[in-house]
Swiss-Prot record:
One of its GO terms (biological process) is toll-like receptor signaling pathway. It is found in: Membrane. Its main location: membrane. It comes from the Eukaryota. Residues 632-775 form the TIR domain. One of its GO terms (cellular component) is receptor complex. Residues 1-19 form the signal peptide. This is Toll-like receptor 10. Belongs to the Toll-like receptor family. Binds MYD88 via their respective TIR domains. Homodimer (Potential).
Length: 811
């Protein structure tokens, strides 16, 4: 605690120094910590740039003149809690920048003074001086602000040497104080005086003189061994020339009558704010409480904090009434294990009441209490259970601020609540309140704290809290962010540590006024429902408290621990309307593409061909190789256009067929089966022929059925070789005349894989020889016999005609 106090005071000094002379940017504080290292002398290897040196809690017993020569920039030196017995301030003559020097809690018996003009803080308290260690040089330290002293004797002459200094704080820390000359303290010129008394010290004289000395007076370690009552019963409790307006008594252990007299004494002084902290009292009450004089006072505030009772022989009701009858504005009785409180049966002037951390119950509000000026009521840390009962009490006051946290409060739906329209701030945290609490809130509330309760949802029947600006509903059981339809002015919302998986869209849309949101540490489910919430931090003016480390995914498991800002949810997968539009556009584009292909590439024709090929492929798979060979009946199938039939009839057929029937030709007209479709007949003819001859001309490429025949022949699945197609170019075909679907034909023509009909009749012999050689197949004798017999039967059935030249074109 001592070190903390030193650091606090040092920070104050540094801030003051910076206000007088701002440091340059390159000048930085460098702290060297050598505390609690059992050092017996100051280290010789200190860094020259050191500005703060802590040598506290060591074994130093003497300081040498050369100890601090190397640290010329030293500003703060802490030497408390060592064993130093003598001090020569000339040791610091080279430390011109020294501002803070702490030598408290040593064994100092003497000090040799040297003018340290820049010193602002000097603490010599809790040492072994016989008298106050003050001389003329101390009076020349014009910048001194905080001074700590100690000594076994206090005399007026000690303080005369520094009476002209205006000090901020004087701290007197005594190990023993057997002698005090009355009237010594008022000589000091200080704003605050803090006295730490040793045991068995008559504090009364110091209290009287202290009130005459400073505006703020603090006294620590007051016990009842000083015979205060017997001493003061012989003296007048009145006091003249009082200066103190703030009085703090800390660590007080007195009989009740002693405390009673202190209250009465202070009541008639200049003290406006009186605080007693860590007080223990007991014993019998000999003084009459009704004798307390409440007149002639400037008292405004009384605080009793951390009150403990020993064996007590007085009714506590009398104590409560003694305090509540005081005509003051502010009363605090906290941490006192107080089971109840009594008020007079007439109106009081209390504006602020603090009964925190007691054991008050609902019985407090079952009596009539007249508080027409009450604005702040603090009842946290008690045993209150019924919220509606509190509201009925508050309705008779102009209450503005109410703290009911850390109680046992509940509210039932059938209980009526009536609050004054003045309530603006209410703390209901750490209770047992459920959803029904929203039906028992003042309409005027502006700041509401409901954290650590049992709230699961904000009911739709909630009172419209149009003035609510801040709502803290953290550490509850909510599964969704509350909408702002009932809180139209809400600007700050804290909803961390609930069970929110996916905040609803209603919050994003209805809470446009929210500027600060704390929704961290919730088990977020990172799906599309969370997309709008994630975008709040980026695309809105909402400040997300704790973003982004406190906002992580809990579900799905593969994203657990992932920060929300690192989760990427695609707009297409989360926006149903956009997804539908995208699908429609894609389908439309595909439809247009298919339509274009159908028009430009004759796609329907290819689809029909694919279907026919598929049927043929399935049929071929079910047919054995022997059956396939047995089905072959012709050497060649001839495909041609009707416009080229004369050439086929007059030239091709006569030159290919022989009278011995060694070459069998299949023509479409001759073997057409009326029971099958045209495409099935074409497939059948191609399957029953070893070769397919195509008579090419401009007429051929314009014929639809010729294209079918070429397509099926090209994809003849039972031919293992690729030479089963024979092309005869009857007339030249310009490439631009060939439709796109004839891409295979184009490729063959480019390779010149065809027989060209010669215009010179003398070359025809060679043409027919090549053609016969191309279609001539070595057929087994048995096969030839079978084929000849079948062919003869077919010829007889067709009236003895060997070849029919009838052809149906472009059916």
């Amino acid at each position: 605690m001592r070190l903390i106090r030193n650091i606090y005071i040092f920070c104050s000094i540094v801030m003051t120094a910076e206000g007088d002379a701002p440091e340059l940017p390159e000048e930085r504080e460098l702290m060297t910590n050598c505390s609690n290292m059992s050092l017996r002398k100051v280290p010789a290897d200190l860094t020259p740039a050191t500005t703060t040196l802590d040598l506290s809690y060591n074994l130093l017993f003497q300081l040498q003149s050369s100890d601090f020569h190397s640290v010329s920039k030293l500003r703060v030196l802490i030497l408390c809690h060592n064993r130093i017995q003598q001090l020569d301030l000339k040791t610091f003559e080279f430390n011109k920048e020294l501002r803070y020097l702490d030598l408290s809690n040593n064994r100092l018996k003497s000090v040799t003074w040297y003018l340290l003009a820049g010193l602002r803080y000097l603490d010599l308290s809790f040492n072994d001086f016989d008298t106050m260690p003050i001389c003329e040089e101390a009076g020349n330290m014009s910048h001194l602000e905080i001074l700590g002293l100690s000594g076994a004797k206090i005399q007026k002459s000690d303080f005369q040497k520094i009476a002209h200094l205006h000090l901020n704080t004087v701290f007197l820390g005594f190990r023993t104080l057997p002698h005090y000359e009355e009237g010594s303290l008022p000589i000091l010129n200080t704003t605050k005086l803090h006295i730490v008394l040793p045991m068995d010290t008559n504090f009364w004289v110091l209290l009287r003189d202290g009130i005459k000395t400073s505006k703020i007076l603090e006294m620590t370690n007051i016990d009842g061994k000083s015979q205060f009552v017997s001493y003061e019963m012989q003296r007048n409790l009145s006091l003249e020339n009082a200066k103190t307006s703030v009085l703090l008594l800390n660590k007080v252990d007195l009989l009740w009558d002693d405390l009673f007299l202190i209250l009465q004494f202070v009541w008639h002084t200049s003290v406006e704010h009186f605080q007693i902290r860590n007080v223990t009292f007991g014993g019998k009450a000999y003084l009459d409480h009704n004798s307390f004089d409440y007149s002639n006072t400037v008292m405004r505030t009384i605080k009793l904090e951390h009150v403990h009772f020993r064996v007590f022989y007085i009714q506590q009701d009398k104590i409560y009434l003694l305090l509540t009858k005081m005509d003051i504005e502010n009363l605090t009785i906290s941490n006192a294990q107080m089971p109840h409180m009594l008020f007079p049966n007439y109106p009081t002037k209390f504006q602020y009441l603090n009964f925190a951390n007691n054991i008050l119950t609902d019985e407090l509000f079952k009596r009539t209490i007249q508080l027409p000026h009450l604005k702040t009521l603090i009842l946290n840390g008690n045993k209150l259970e019924t919220l509606s009962l509190v509201s009925c009490f508050a309705n008779n006051t102009p209450l503005e601020h109410l703290d009911l946290s850390q109680n046992l409060l509940q509210h039932k739906n059938d209980e009526n609540c009536s609050w004054p329209e003045t309530v603006v701030n209410m703390n209901l945290s750490y209770n047992k309140l459920s959803d029904s609490v929203f039906r028992c809130l003042p309409k005027s509330i502006q700041i509401l704290d409901l954290n650590n309760n049992q709230i699961q949802t904000v009911p739709k029947e909630t009172i419209h809290l149009m003035a609510l600006r801040e709502l803290n509903i953290a550490f509850n059981f909510l599964t969704d962010l509350p909408g702002c339809s009932h809180f139209s002015r809400l600007s700050v919302l804290n909803i961390e540590m609930n069970f929110i998986l996916s905040p609803s869209l209603d919050f994003v849309q209805s809470c446009q006024e929210v500027k600060t949101l704390n929704a961290g540490r919730n088990p977020f489910r990172c799906t599309c429902e969370l997309k709008n919430f994630i975008q709040l931090e980026t695309y809105s003016e909402v400040m997300m408290v704790g973003w982004s480390d406190s906002y992580t995914c809990e579900y799905p498991l593969n994203l657990r621990g992932t920060r929300l800002k690192d989760v990427h949810l695609h707009e297409l997968s989360c926006n149903t309307a956009l997804l539908i539009v995208t699908i429609v556009v894609i389908m439309l584009v595909l439809g247009l593409a298919v339509a274009f292909c159908c028009l430009h590439f004759d796609l329907p024709w290819y689809l029909r061909m694919l279907g026919q090929c598929t049927q043929t492929w399935h049929r071929v798979r079910k047919t054995t190789q022997e059956q396939l060979k047995r089905n072959v009946r012709f050497h060649a199938f001839i495909s041609y256009s009707e416009h080229d039939s004369l050439w086929v009839k007059n030239e091709l057929i006569p030159n290919l067929e022989k009278e011995d029937g060694s070459i069998l030709i299949c023509l479409y007209e001759s073997y057409f089966d009326p029971g099958k479709s045209i495409s099935e007949n074409i497939v059948s003819f191609i399957e029953k022929s070893y070769k397919s001859i195509f008579v090419l001309s401009p007429n051929f490429v314009q014929n639809e059925w010729c294209h079918y025949e070429f397509y099926f022949a090209h994809h003849n699945l039972f031919h293992e070789n690729s030479d089963h197609i024979i092309l005869i170019l009857l007339e030249p075909i310009p490439f631009y005349c060939i439709p796109t679907r004839y891409h295979k034909l184009k490729a063959l023509l480019e390779k010149k894989a065809y027989l060209e009909w010669p215009k010179d009749r003398r070359k025809c012999g060679l043409f027919w020889a090549n053609l016969r050689a191309a279609i001539n197949v070595n057929v087994l004798a048995t096969r030839e016999m079978y084929e000849l017999q079948t062919f003869t039967e077919l010829n007889e059935e067709s009236r003895g005609s060997t070849i029919s030249l009838m052809r149906t074109d472009c059916l």
